[in-house]
Amino acid sequence: MLNKIIETKKEEIQNLQLPEQQNVAKRSFLDALSNPNRELALIAEVKKASPSKGLIKENFQPVEIAKAYEKGKADALSVLTDQHYFQGHRTFLSDIKQHVSVPVLRKDFIIDSIQVEESARIGADAILLIGEALEPLKLQELYLQAAEKELDCLVEVHSLETLEKLLAVFTPKIIGINNRNLHTFETSLQQTKEIAKHVPKDQLLVSESGIYLYDDVSYVKEAGAKAILVGESLMRQDNQTKAIEKLFGESEYAH
């Protein structure tokens, strides 16, 4: 599936028109995750659909969802901008950025320098770079380009093999372990537990996917995660603010 998405991206890049520069303040994604509101930093994801789950949110109002996340004390937001597979759009990110005061991560399949430039222009504070989608040297090149644009990077891996190849080239400040198997789409928090042992101690570790309950939060924290990225389990709730409180065991419905 990832290969298919990358091929689509390559085609999209051929026709990519760069938007006007958004006049919005840059906010540090790294600082927000390093100084969390709770025991773990929360990156709450604004996501309408996905290839594995189909449509997640029918009445999709990205700005309202983002505001509800901020009210629930999310430390940062992640916004899907991939149109073809996730029904996202770059305007969702630009619109959200106008209405919240927390940093916003652009969640997309970034494989080319023009997309880094595009991310900066639409107002992103950080971008996702996927270890399985890029050769380590290419990933490092995009990472450095992002830094020049004052963009932080969440560098995501799905396997120990990818992490080791990456660390042989350079050490990203923020490393995400995605708990979803790229071939089966199944999630297992064991991924975080196993791979976390090999992440250098000074790096900020994010556990992504498959986090639904407070027990899951505790499990990945115990494994060494300093932050979590949660999308689907929050998006499926009617009230995103309450959903965050429930996830962290703060509401009366938590147990």
From Swiss-Prot:
Molecular functions per Gene Ontology: indole-3-glycerol-phosphate synthase activity; phosphoribosylanthranilate isomerase activity
Any one GO biological process: L-tryptophan biosynthetic process
Amino-acid biosynthesis as UniProt keyword: yes
EC number: 4.1.1.48
Pathway: Amino-acid biosynthesis; L-tryptophan biosynthesis; L-tryptophan from chorismate: step 4/5
Top-tier EC class: lyase
Reaction equation(s) it catalyzes: 1-(2-carboxyphenylamino)-1-deoxy-D-ribulose 5-phosphate + H(+) = (1S,2R)-1-C-(indol-3-yl)glycerol 3-phosphate + CO2 + H2O
One Pfam family hit: IGPS
Keyword NADP appears in the UniProt entry: no
Alphabetical UniProt keywords: Amino-acid biosynthesis, Aromatic amino acid biosynthesis, Decarboxylase, Lyase, Tryptophan biosynthesis
PANTHER family: INDOLE-3-GLYCEROL-PHOSPHATE SYNTHASE (PTHR22854:SF2), TRYPTOPHAN BIOSYNTHESIS PROTEIN (PTHR22854)
Similarity-based family: Belongs to the TrpC family.
Protein name in UniProt: Indole-3-glycerol phosphate synthase
Organism of this sequence: Priestia megaterium (strain ATCC 12872 / QMB1551) (Bacillus megaterium)
Gene symbol of the encoding locus: trpC
